[in-house]
Amino acid sequence: MGIDPGLTRCGLSVVQAGKGRSVIPVAVGVVRTPPHAELSQRLLELSEAVNSWIDEYQPDVVAIERIFERGNVSTVMNTAHGVGVLVLAAAQRGLPVHMYTPSEVKKAISGNGRADKKQMTAMITRILGLVEAPKPADAADALALAVCHCWRAPMLAIHNSQR
């Protein structure tokens, strides 16, 4: 399961890893919370949505974008609260959580750690063989996170076994 965290829009996706670099899209969507609602209400709505997705799709692992300082402290703090809710939902079910920076995801998907949204959306559409690009960008980002993890998981397993 790939998650592009956000409090106003949170991208959620589920993919199935195949042989080699084959990845099959299962589901993609965006959870929206009202920007003017109380923080506690927004976090509750996000929690209910992600828990519903986890219950429905039964993922083995969760990949979440690591938040980084974007200049607006309030936005970063709200996103951090959301990430806490997302990580907790996974932890309550014993699901491992892997965090990836935006540049790690961009590099894995496009080969360029500085790829823009348009390039990333085009690449994820092509990689997954989608008829049309996922919208909004949060949905495409969630798919990119899931694919990134599928492709990196074998390397993580090798690295962890060598410890």
From Swiss-Prot:
E.C. number(s) listed in UniProt: 3.1.21.10
Cofactor binding annotation: Binds 2 Mg(2+) ion per subunit.
Keywords associated with the record: Cytoplasm, DNA damage, DNA recombination, DNA repair, DNA-binding, Endonuclease, Hydrolase, Magnesium, Metal-binding, Nuclease
Subcellular location(s) of the protein: Cytoplasm
Cysteines paired by S-S bonds: none
GO terms under cellular component: cytoplasm; Holliday junction resolvase complex
Reactions this protein catalyses: Endonucleolytic cleavage at a junction such as a reciprocal single-stranded crossover between two homologous DNA duplexes (Holliday junction)
Biological processes, Gene Ontology terms: DNA recombination; DNA repair
Record: active site: D4, E65, D138
InterPro entries registered for this protein in UniProt: RNaseH-like_sf, RNaseH_sf, X-over_junc_endoDNase_Mg_BS, X-over_junc_endoDNase_RuvC
CDD domains: RuvC
GO molecular function: crossover junction DNA endonuclease activity; DNA binding; magnesium ion binding
Binding residues annotated for Mg(2+) 2, in chain numbering: E65
Residues that bind Mg(2+) 1: D4, D138
Cofactor: Mg(2+)
Coiled coil: none
Predominant location: cytoplasm
NCBIfam families the UniProt entry points to: ruvC
Family label: Belongs to the RuvC family.
Subunit structure: Homodimer which binds Holliday junction (HJ) DNA. The HJ becomes 2-fold symmetrical on binding to RuvC with unstacked arms; it has a different conformation from HJ DNA in complex with RuvA. In the full resolvosome a probable DNA-RuvA(4)-RuvB(12)-RuvC(2) complex forms which resolves the HJ.
Entry function: The RuvA-RuvB-RuvC complex processes Holliday junction (HJ) DNA during genetic recombination and DNA repair. Endonuclease that resolves HJ intermediates. Cleaves cruciform DNA by making single-stranded nicks across the HJ at symmetrical positions within the homologous arms, yielding a 5'-phosphate and a 3'-hydroxyl group; requires a central core of homology in the junction. The consensus cleavage sequence is 5'-(A/T)TT(C/G)-3'. Cleavage occurs on the 3'-side of the TT dinucleotide at the point of strand exchange.
Entry-linked HAMAP family: RuvC
Name of the featured protein: Crossover junction endodeoxyribonuclease RuvC
